[in-house]
């Protein structure tokens, strides 16, 4: 009796399995094994960080590969995991025979204790390739005094609200300062940011003037912008040329020259 009750379900399952296998065979015959969909053009926009040859090597996409034999998302993920100097990549298939790859370079927002190590705007650590050293020569350098801080490439540094404590948090807060300072209307350009002092973030400008900001006051972007604006207004004043060091104290609403 039980066999008689289950027999229709078993037949239905067998039919569904057969339909699925037939669909898979037909799909491969029509698409994955169809020479009509063999790649004839691979169009690559490589940027600067990765060459066209490197992209071809990592992705494995070349003339003759079938468009339906690979997942564009999986190939993209492999490319980004292999080439950390890329921030993003777009891989698109265009029927019947074209693949387009657009690579987007990871742009350094600051160097980190070395001309060869950098942070992007999100705190991702990556190496600056020798061929890119001159291109990023003007990117400001975050330093930690006599104790260089060199986290492994591939990490993303973290920050927390409030007063930054610890080297990593101070580095991330200095990164925010560098990003918020990078505006064409500023009266000064940052060259170095030293996070080694537990009380002050020490900024060195391109014309060798020193600006000190109090860590306890750099609690968020609003406070950072206020401090930079105060420094900006002070350095625009012709009277500031008599000074080389400027202490920005938000709580007092003043900049003290020395």
Outline where the language-model segments fall.
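Short phosphate-engaging motifs
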Residues: 51
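Extended, alpha-helix-rich binding/interface surfaces that flank or overlap catalytic cores
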Residues: 44
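Acidic-histidine catalytic/liganding microenvironments
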Residues: 82-83
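Charged, solvent-exposed interaction patches on well-folded alpha/beta domains
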Residues: 1-41, 57-58, 64-78, 87-258
